């Protein structure tokens, strides 16, 4: 199974590829990086993940890239790790919330649903890249 994550300072959005369908999963709410890396490690183990797709912004965001790479090194995972450009994934995910009212949009941002929808966009990009290369 393949899992994607959108690593943020407060939340980690999670999406999985199940039988060819990309689904958002419950986001990991970060209290600190050790707790968050432990929670992600547990999820990877529970779901028997073989490939972890991680969103990273373009090179002009050096601090963010370094923070994401450091966090991923804390994760206990022996499978394949693939970094995919995440530019605009949160904006694209937010556009999928147009049907929600203002209050529900705010809740979707706070509870991590937006982050997991962003992880779905990252996983879509990974799938497109894999298909293009085959």
Swiss-Prot record:
SUPFAM superfamilies on file: Ribonuclease H-like
Pfam families documented for this protein: RuvX
Keyword Hydrolase among record annotations: yes
Keyword annotations of the record: Cytoplasm, Hydrolase, Nuclease, Ribosome biogenesis
Record-listed E.C. numbers: 3.1.-.-
Top EC class of this enzyme: hydrolase
GO CC annotations on file: cytosol
Annotated Gene3D superfamilies: YqgF/RNase H-like domain
One MF annotation (Gene Ontology) recorded for this entry: nuclease activity
Keyword Nuclease set for record: yes
Chief location: cytoplasm
Cell location: Cytoplasm
Domain of life: Bacteria
Record-level GO BP terms: rRNA 5'-end processing
SMART domains per UniProt: YqgFc (SM00732)
NCBIfam families: PRK00109.2-2, RNAse_H_YqgF
Family stated for the protein in its record: Belongs to the YqgF nuclease family.
Physiological role: Could be a nuclease involved in processing of the 5'-end of pre-16S rRNA.
Protein name as it appears in the record: Putative pre-16S rRNA nuclease
Species of the source: Helicobacter pylori (strain HPAG1)
């Amino acid at each position: 199974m393949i899992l994607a994550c959108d690593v943020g300072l407060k939340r980690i959005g999670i999406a999985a590829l199940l039988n060819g369908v990309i689904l958002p999963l419950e986001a990991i709410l970060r209290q600190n990086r050790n707790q968050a890396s432990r929670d992600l490690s547990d999820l990877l183990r529970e779901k028997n993940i073989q490939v972890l797709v991680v969103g990273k912004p373009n090179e002009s965001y050096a601090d963010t890239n370094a923070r994401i790479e450091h966090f991923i090194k804390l994760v206990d995972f022996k499978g394949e790790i693939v970094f995919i450009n995440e530019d605009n994934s949160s904006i694209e995910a937010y556009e999928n919330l147009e049907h929600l009212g203002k209050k529900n949009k705010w809740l979707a941002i706070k509870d991590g649903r937006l982050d997991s929808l962003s992880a779905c966009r990252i996983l879509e990009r990974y799938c497109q890249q894999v298909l293009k290369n085959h």
